[in-house]
């Protein structure tokens, strides 16, 4: 009996030890493997990169065909300041785009167009002064270029008020090379790419002062250029403008 008691006691000790070890092991084991626990990630929204705004004076041109916004170049200060002055004095309000030629340009700024009869030939009105030419080889007649109209004069001085915006067309490398020879010009690789892919009127480069460019509203130029017109290239339905400075 003593042997049995010792045997039972021994079994009890072994069982208790085993149970104690099992509980210790159970406490040390996590319900999920450590490798499955993912660290918390603080997801922040990607920062939007704002477009860089080029410094300069901007003019809003509201027309019957839509809105155009042009940037005036600081490289042509005489034209920039004169144009801004006329805009701020409301000179252009209610004037017409009196001459439009698809694949070339749209022209306006004739003061005689404000109250012109429907059959009146326009384009000779002015403000009584001209502006000295401000040519810069980096400013060219790409599509959307804003340039000053002028009469035929040796100094190539600009009209004090009439302007045009280029619609133009696309040119091949061969055509650009021919213009270079004809006009004695040089078209840089960047200009060639612009004239080939975007279009413009390269024949006018260094002949008429370019003093700005369209930032918004190229499609408006296309619409105006396609307007029905009479034999003087004047739109049959009046296309009026209102100009204001934006900055």
Predicted regions and their residues:
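Cyclophilin-like peptidyl-prolyl cis-trans isomerases
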Residues: 20-247
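Bacterial Sec-dependent N-terminal signal peptides
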Residues: 1-25
